[in-house]
UniProtKB/Swiss-Prot annotation:
Gene3D superfamilies found in the cross-reference section: Winged helix-like DNA-binding domain superfamily/Winged helix DNA-binding domain
Domain remarks in the Swiss-Prot or TrEMBL record: The winged helix domain is involved in binding to DNA in the preinitiation complex.
Entry's Gene Ontology molecular function annotations: DNA binding
Protein name: Transcription factor E
Transmembrane segments: none
InterPro entries hit by this protein: TF_E_archaea (IPR016481), TFE (IPR039997), TFIIE/TFIIEa_HTH (IPR017919), TFIIE_asu (IPR002853), TFIIEa/SarR/Rpc3_HTH_dom (IPR024550), WH-like_DNA-bd_sf (IPR036388), WH_DNA-bd_sf (IPR036390)
Complex and partners: Monomer. Interaction with RNA polymerase subunits RpoF and RpoE is necessary for Tfe stimulatory transcription activity. Able to interact with Tbp and RNA polymerase in the absence of DNA promoter. Interacts both with the preinitiation and elongation complexes.
Keywords, in A-Z order: DNA-binding, Transcription, Transcription regulation
Amino acid sequence: MAKKKVKYTFDYDSKFLNEHNVKKLAYELTHDSDTSNKILDCLFTAEVTDEQIAEATGIKLNFVRKILYKFYDVGMANYTRKKDPETQWFTYYWRFDSRKAAQILEKQYNHHNQEIKESIEYEENNMFFVCPNGCRYPFDEATEFQFICPRCNEKLEFKDNSDLIHDLKKLESAYKINE
């Protein structure tokens, strides 16, 4: 029997929320894309219990709970606790939190984007010198070492970094989100 594709719909509007980004975030938390994707599929289907997720996915209950708690710890999943009047046991109903996931993704995006910008600025504002073994130093350090590599005692030669700057700018433009 063919598995039905789950449609990821979000109750919060954000340029960062899409199925790819959510699955990537889940993988970063769990380092297990197959399992986390199955659990996410359940969370996007309805508000579900951990037992229902385990039954639907075939994943052991304790492993389902472990991943749900990882999602909960960062805020991308929440639960409602309800007490069974007969057994007096609590049942936890889990759901995906679109708003918090969007905030996490936006924070990650801003962090990575800032790192790229800082790298471009650093590369544009410095000249670099390398030894035959690939050790790389900015001009200030190279002059301190009298253009001799402190690691291998080889001569440091100027290295044009315009290709690296070009690649970083390409990465920066590819990383921008359409607004």
